[in-house]
Amino acid sequence: MPLTWHRPESPSLASYSNCWRLSPGAELVQDRLAHKLDVARGTVVRYFDLLESLFLIHRLPAGSRNLTKRQIQRPKVFLIDTGLNAALSNMDAAHLSSMQGADHLGPLLEQFVVCELLRHQEWSATPFKLFHYRDRQGAEVDIIVETPAGIIAVEVTSTAAATARHFQHLKALRDRLGDEFLAGIVLTTSTGQKAGDRLESLPVSSLWSR
């Protein structure tokens, strides 16, 4: 009887993208993902390179040249199309506006803001780079916009108004960077207001209405 050999099935590209479908903006830990999918780490690297070349995902790098060396260096991963992400996850407007959907709305809104800023890079008169920030003491900022003149730090919240908690890490970054810190902005789902020296909240709609 002839021996037969069955090649083990490799996870599909969908398996990789699905890892960020329900948790957009999660940090990429390649070893952990390789273990979860039962593949070699090199396979994870190749698949993510392919997903990125197909413009299905974006890896938001950690840190910036102006920040501390205490920061964690893992990138965050976002699916490029927020609407597709919501549709594949069966999350409609009714769900996202409900109490049960509150935990999903925040990450989706952060994903949307990152994708909008990526589009802005194509036509902005001021060149800028995008990063995220998290250090070993737990300080975290959703998005760092690095311009030639300095840094703009951005937090994203699905709440209608920003509170002192939303500005906590922005203030710490402002005090650490001094004049290099241009602004700290909390993007909300409603109106904005001033919140101190170089700090303010703005509606998400300001990304395309200003």
Give the predicted meaning of each segment.
Residues 149-150, 179-183:
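Short glycine-/polar-rich loops that comprise or flank the Walker A/P-loop
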Residues 189-210:
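Domain-level recognition of nuclease-like catalytic cores that cleave nucleotide substrates
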Residues 134, 157, 187-188:
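Short beta-strand/turn micro-motifs composed of small residues
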Residues 156-164:
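Short beta-strand-loop-alpha-helix junction that forms the active-site gateway
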Residues 86-87, 163-164, 193-197:
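Switch/connector loops and helix/strand junctions flanking conserved nucleotide-binding motifs
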